[in-house]
Design a protein with these regions (language model features):
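Amphipathic, soluble alpha/beta structural segments
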Residues: 111-143, 245
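Functionally constrained cores in energy, signaling, and assembly domains
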Residues: 1, 7-8, 14, 18, ...
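Secondary-structure capping and boundary motifs in well-ordered enzyme cores
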Residues: 3-6, 33, 64-74, 86-90, ...
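Charge-dense, low-complexity intrinsically disordered segments
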Residues: 1, 21-24, 28, 133, ...
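Catalytic cores of carbohydrate-active enzymes
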Residues: 6-122, 164, 168-196, 248, ...
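Non-catalytic C-terminal accessory modules of carbohydrate-active enzymes
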Residues: 100-104, 128-135, 145-296
Length: 296
């Protein structure tokens, strides 16, 4: 299922590129394909409360409500929302399922409950020791996908909750048990179905550092480049009053000041560049410096 949602996301990216280049026939083709993929995903992969993980070669669904083990999975539900493929109501329900079933104080479980019986129809994951690595652990790499997904739905509170849980810094008072540095993401943390629940393993051996930075800066802080502009669309906890960030975009430096006087989680009310109201942040001269004030 995750790959189906990635397919949809890739198609939407191609649509944006085709529109930018004026390739209207390509854009039309990709839009039709994306709509088809979206309809099929919402029809075939939705299980009533969350999205399933996949379908085996024999036609059996993985990660559905009838499953005693491996009922809820992180990757498919996060990407259903992050890609934009999920209908609004389903997207909110998928986030709720992630929060309700997969959240732990150490991060989000990859799946739950862990598999305890080998099942070759499903595959390798059912032979991994319960609560470790791919079988019910807090696998770091996919966690940031859920942070970004929460931001897509305007849930800055949920994004921050998920971010804080995985952040190594907040686990440093448990260092004797965690057995990992407070400045490194780990490949995984033992899940709740393991006797060493909360113990981290394989620091630095993970792609989660890059994904964490990507999700935190481009979705939570909401600062991300586009073809013709630098976009700023934060999604933060309502109790954040302000934040600052510096972003170099195509050779120019932007000092970004975001103020949140009304205590909202998402929604830009006004942008000022060097004191002048603007609706877009266009590329500027290389070496130039600018102050961007954003009011939510």
């Amino acid at each position: 299922a995750m790959v189906s949602f990635l397919h949809y996301w890739a198609l939407t990216e191609f649509i944006g590129l085709a529109d930018h280049l004026g390739e209207w026939e390509d854009a039309k083709k990709y839009k039709a394909a994306a709509q088809h993929v979206k309809e099929v995903c919402n029809r075939e992969l939705w299980d009533g409360e969350w999205f399933i993980r996949g379908i085996t070669a024999s036609g059996r669904k993985i990660g559905c409500q009838e499953d005693a083990e491996g009922r809820v999975h992180l990757e498919s539900n996060a990407w259903a929302v992050l890609s934009g493929a999920a209908d609004a109501e389903k997207a909110d329900a998928a986030l709720q399922a992630i929060d309700e079933y997969l959240y732990t104080p150490y991060g989000l479980l990859l799946n739950t409950p862990s598999y305890t019986v080998p099942d070759d129809d499903i595959g390798f994951v059912t032979r991994v020791y319960p609560g470790l690595k791919e079988n019910g652990a807090i696998f770091s790499h996919p966690n940031p996908w859920a942070w970004a997904a929460a931001c897509v739905r305007g849930r800055g509170d949920l994004a921050m909750k998920f971010y804080d849980a995985l952040c190594p810094y907040w686990q440093n008072d448990k260092i004797e048990f965690r057995e990992s540095e407070p400045y490194s993401y780990c490949q995984f943390i033992a899940g709740k179905d393991h006797s060493a629940y909360g113990r981290a393993r394989h620091p630095f051996m993970t792609g989660s550092g890059g994904w964490s930075y990507f999700a935190a800066t481009r979705y939570m802080l909401g600062i991300r480049p586009d073809y013709d502009e630098l976009k700023i669309d934060p999604c933060i906890p309502a109790d954040w009053k302000s934040f600052r960030a510096t972003r170099v975009f195509r050779g120019a430096s932007y000092e970004i000041i975001v103020n949140n006087p009304d205590g909202v989680m998402k929604g830009v009310k006004e942008i000022r560049i060097d004191g002048v109201p603007s609706d877009r942040i266009k590329p500027s001269r290389t070496g130039s410096r600018h102050v961007v004030e954003v009011t939510l």
